[in-house]
Amino acid sequence: MFYNKESDFEDDLVAVLKRHGWTDGVLEYPTEQDLISNWANILFDNNKGIDRLNGQRLTKGEMAQILEQIETLRTPLALNSFINGKTVSIKRDNPKDEAHYGKEISLKIYDRQEIAAGQSRYQIARQPMYPAKNKMLNDRRGDVCLLINGMPVIHIELKKSGIPISQATNQIAKYAHEGVFTGLFRLVQVFVAMNPDDAVYFANPGEGDFNSNYFFHWADFNNEPIAANKHVGQDEWKRFASDLLSIPMAHQLIGFYTVADSADGCLKVLRSYQYQAVNAISDRVRTCKWDEPVPSGTPGRPGGYVWHTTGSGKTMTSFKAAQLIAGSKDADKVIFLMDRIELGTQSLLEYRSFADDADDVQGTENTDVLKAKLASIDPKDTLIVTSIQKMSNIKAGEGHITEEEVKKLAGKRIVFIIDECHRSTFGEMLQDIRRSFPNALYFGFTGTPIHEENRKKGSTTSMVFGDCLHRYSIADGIRDGNVLGFDPYMVLTYRDRDVRQVVALEKAKASTIEEAQADPAKAEVFYHYMDPNQMPMGPMETQAGERIKGIEDYLTSAQYAQGTPHEGKVVEDILDQFPLLSRGNKFHAMLATSSIPEAISYYRLFKERAPQMHVTALFDPNVDNSNGAILKGDALQEIIGDYNELFGKDFIIPTWPKMKKDITARLSHKRPYLTVDQHREEQLDLLIVVDQMLTGFDSKWVNTLYLDKIIDYENIIQAFSRTNRLFGPDKPFGTIRYYRKPHTMKGYIEAAVK
């Protein structure tokens, strides 16, 4: 349907909302004071009992106390915790309540678990009046505001047919700039901008920027966007309203699917694919028949796996799934499991930053602490973050753990959520866990699942975890603008002709071109390898799946060894490109190398050729007695010493893990480096790695990966995805520059992104 008048569209939207759960009345043209009085009435109805308001209504002074708390909390981030904190405390000043006069009482305001039930009230405010905060400005009117228990939590701005929703989002941003969303309206958590054919929703950024990268379209289970200007005139807005804005969904959106991220200092809202995954997992747990025997075969109940592209917010999705399960009481323990000990730091911090209370997420310093938290019946110990290494040590005969203790723990209803499950599941450690906890339910999260074509040790992801519960591919993510695309560049450190000639001469067993040409047999071989039509630079695959070798297959590692021109050319290219790609040191970069000795060599080359650059290296610090141990030990001391001098730190080899945390925080601009972009002397320009940080590390401030190693399949997507977090117009894509066997890598990249 085509709407010539916005008011007609508003009438129809309100009618749809009333049919989908907003059944407790429509307030027409309310002022802020009208809404405060309405809230006071609902608070009275929900708290009139003898232990709370004792049958006596709230006074203006008592409502002013609540509004003062809202004004003090100020940000949508803090107010999300206020709303979801269930209660608010006031000091009674109503003399009619003799029992509580002058005393503090607690009032219930909202319960995320009372979905379309209990005391929850759902109202619509039409054309609410927003008082101007500046005498120079007029009062403003909104279009529609949705109230849960009297609190204005969703603000909707409408436009008639043919008017782009950018006008609605700009209007919301303008109102915010004018101070419209203050007072009671600070409680708004989610904004919606819509016309009959297009609609987006986004978290209230408060005093932050309104970034269109975080305006989301809603989509169905198959990631097909709803009301995204694709089906003009077909009333797509009705699907949007009945899906996202309906009750129970809108109640859950505020209670469960917003995230107050204390690390980033902002309120976030889940995208539709994150909701679909969380919902699928919580449904699977809710319907699990714990008393029924486990299916035969591998110990443990297969819950399924979530395939969401790297960079799409898997940690937040897995956290929300874990939080919902923990809050639902459908399981006794929810354990978020990571593959590597070092990844635990970032994931634990992220989990805690997402939680209502950091204490709701339990870390595990060692196996004894983990055992104690597993045995605990304290609700605070329900949600545990630990590593696969520690968890695999919870077995009979390990340390001081008895078989009886393991049996008792295994008797609990335990849900495992395994991060980066393509990596962590293919080893003996997961089997140990499954043998110790055969009744547990196992879920996996991965951006790069193992399929038949890249399976390891005979196992695909579905063999280990069961069905794919939800898929959101890299193509979906790039299409929706939820992750950035990649811009890969093949950089030749040797000319193709020179490489081809070296291989051709070697195969012809000739030292010079003249020697090859002088002997017909040698000439035939020589020209075979020199002809691109007969011998490609990189390997090829026939339609039958047969691999045909390319010139680069005949190169030895000596071509790229330390001290060769290759290393110098890589450094030269990075130094040439870095000022432009980093946008004048705004963004950081990573250089991935093939070995620790190479990482050390590159580190020293950068020190020598670019002393002004802030460079460090990160690799496994364990020094053993193998060849190269002395080099590695000396290099560690050098790298740590340089880092200490550069940034005023005092790390030593035994505190290397703390240095890694510091590097992670510095690259991510997380505490204590939230404002590092304003302090050049605190910034790290380039991090040199071998394997560490190429998986599981997230920072929107990293925009370039320099790659001097051969990787394939899922490892390509994992490594490239270090660069694909959204930032803004200064970061349109993640840049990749690759150097080693570049034609081979080009083929691998094309295969990986198919």
Predicted regions and their residues:
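Conserved segment of the helicase C-terminal RecA-like domain
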Residues: 722-753
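Conserved C-terminal RecA-like helicase domain
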Residues: 535-689
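A short beta-strand element within the Helicase C-terminal
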Residues: 686-689, 693-718, 734-738
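Inter-Walker segment of RecA-like/P-loop motor cores
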Residues: 353-399
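Interdomain helical connector at the RecA1-RecA2 junction of SF1/SF2 helicase-like NTPases
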Residues: 231-233, 455-586, 603-608
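ATP-dependent helicase/translocase motor core
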Residues: 1-333, 342, 346-357, 379-380, ...
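Conserved helicase ATPase motor motifs in RecA-like P-loop NTPase domains
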Residues: 309-310, 420-424, 436-454, 481
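Conserved RecA-like ASCE ATPase "motif II neighborhood" in helicase/translocase motors
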Residues: 383-418, 423-432, 670, 689-691
